[in-house]
Amino acid sequence: MSVLVNKNSKVIVQGFTGSEGTFHAEQMIAYGTNVVGGITPNKGGQTHLGKPVFNTVADAVKATGADVSIIFVPPAFAADAIMEAAEAGIKVIITITEGIPVSDMVKVAAYIKNRDCRLIGPNCPGVITPEEAKVGIMPGFIFKKGHVGIVSKSGTLTYEAADQIVRQGLGITTAIGIGGDPIIGTTTKEAVELLMNDPETHCIVMIGEIGGQLEPEAARWIKANGNKKPVVSFIAGETAPKGRTMGHAGAIVGGAEDTAEAKKRILRECGVHVVDSPAKIGEKVKEIMSK
């Protein structure tokens, strides 16, 4: 089992013929992801990387039956690309683009609210189900199949956690990079819930950071639902000064509850295994899964 993407996912690339879209589509195809085509307006009818190019998502869905899209569209046009994918019936929309205006994402959130689709991102590394499908920009060779799910706001810390888990002789079911922007399509809690409901996932790693209340919200949900599976967490930004964004637009300490210290306290109170250094994630997972 896996969540969001697997070997049967039919993936299209929006922004297919641009430099980013081309580079990462090549990597995804090489990984074995079932990329069935891509979108670049006014280039429909051409082929690119041996796959058909379409003018619209609707055309691509009609021709290929695509159900997953990955978006490499520039920030000014990315919100329209997300809404176009939702309108065309794409079930999982993974948005890599960073720098989409918050006002645009407010519109997107309202637009997709009652639609049967799930947005991952924006400003995220994507989703990988090892040895089945990589829909994102992560280095696929780090990930091996196993029973640990990862939910993360940070791309690089996702790769670090996966590498440590694999070095401990374990593996990953699905890793979900939810994105570091203030408005994202899938929250930490929602991603954790997907993995809690996946029978193949026996342990979850939750990587968060300062700013917002996504991790405490997830922790309270985990506790309210009986701590069914062990969750290991690391919160980045321990030494961040108040009021300054740290790397991600959403990583800013506003109120007292936004600090790493406050979040870690809440997580521990909810029965989550918190580590104080990212270097300890793999060890902690191994320790818990050996019990």
Locate the predicted segments by residue:
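Catalytic-core regions of core metabolic enzymes
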Residues: 1-291
